[in-house]
Amino acid sequence: MGERRIIHIDMDYFFAQVEMRDKPELKGKPVIVGGKASGRGVVSTASYEARKFGVHSAMPMAQAHKLCPDGYYVQPRFEVYKETSQIIMDIFKSYTEIVEPMSLDEAYLDITHLVRPDLSASAIAQFIRRDIWEKTGLTSSAGISYNKFLAKLASGMNKPNGITVIHYNNVNEILMNLDIGDFPGVGKATKEVMHTNGIYNGQDLYNKDERELIRIFGKRGHGLYQKARGIDHKPVKNFRIRKSVGTERTFATDINDDEEILLKVRELSEKTAERLSRIQKSGKTVTVKIKTYQFETLSRQRSLRDPIRSDIDIYNTAYSLYNELKDPDVPIRLIGVTVGNLEATEYENMSIYDFL
């Protein structure tokens, strides 16, 4: 098996950035999202302007008010954050099926199968970050490396709105000079134990014998020993294998104009083909779904002998299925095109432009 390519995407000050996006008057201000200071509320997210005052996540809100009395304090809107997160996760899944969400605002992506001589991991990460910006108006940071630990570390090295790559040829320099508190997974309590045992940076950790680390930290000692050497064999665990790819659109008004509907079918076929191309899949079934003005859902599906993924092939099949479904006297409000029964696609004829 060749070298893996893992991306860790971390949204920049996610909750605060969403609030600044939706309330432009907050841009450039010290924004703190969290519970009420009068109770036991804590800071969920602080903008970089607020962090300059020492405010950080998980800090009691009362303490944040003392550090930044002129800050802009905002109650969290979790439904909005969840909706925005879903858009971001859908972008990830349009590139690869192997996505491991860690929270609303971060995830690991295994893109090993996408990287080629003419398409680097850095380029793919830039495309993903571009899509996030265009669809949500939010910036993100990306870390790229050959394992999850290093990708996570890299994503925090050039924030906000940055991208960092850790290669085999620079990993030792980065790890040896890294403050021990900056190692992913080393919190305040662990850091104190590290200092007690003379470990202040990656070089100090590297110099410790594995048995000694196990004596100090128990089972965690083995993992810390490996981290000091940039070792992490854990796979990116995707929680769902995609069985189909599709898109649908709701019309502003109910329509029964064939020409207008077929233009939309063509557009949906192109979008579906683009998503298939990104995840390097083809499919052997095509489904067309319509919803009538009376909210009745109708669909037709066709199984094909050979898998397809081009927009022309998808459209031709979808066109035929729509003709089986249509009723000139029944306006429709929604139409969708889906390709299912997916299988891997050879990519030698693909180019970087499939990702643009």
Swiss-Prot record:
InterPro entries: DNA/RNA_pol_sf, DNA_pol_Y-fam_lit_finger_sf, DNA_pol_Y-fam_little_finger, DNA_polymerase-Y, DNApol_IV, IMS_HHH_1, Rev_trsase/Diguanyl_cyclase, UmuC. It is found in: Cytoplasm. Mg(2+) binds at D10, D105. Coiled coil: none annotated. One of its GO terms (biological process) is DNA-templated DNA replication. It catalyses: DNA(n) + a 2'-deoxyribonucleoside 5'-triphosphate = DNA(n+1) + diphosphate. The keyword Translocase does not apply. Its EC number is 2.7.7.7. One of its GO terms (molecular function) is magnesium ion binding. The record marks F15 as: Substrate discrimination. Binds 2 magnesium ions per subunit. Gene3D superfamilies: 3.30.70.270, 3.40.1170.60, 5' to 3' exonuclease, C-terminal subdomain, DNA polymerase, Y-family, little finger domain. Residues 6-187 form the UmuC domain. The active site is at E106. Its main location: cytoplasm. Monomer. Poorly processive, error-prone DNA polymerase involved in untargeted mutagenesis. Copies undamaged DNA at stalled replication forks, which arise in vivo from mismatched or misaligned primer ends. These misaligned primers can be extended by PolIV. Exhibits no 3'-5' exonuclease (proofreading) activity. May be involved in translesional synthesis, in conjunction with the beta clamp from PolIII. This is DNA polymerase IV. The lineage of its organism: Bacteria, Bacillati, Bacillota, Bacilli, Bacillales.
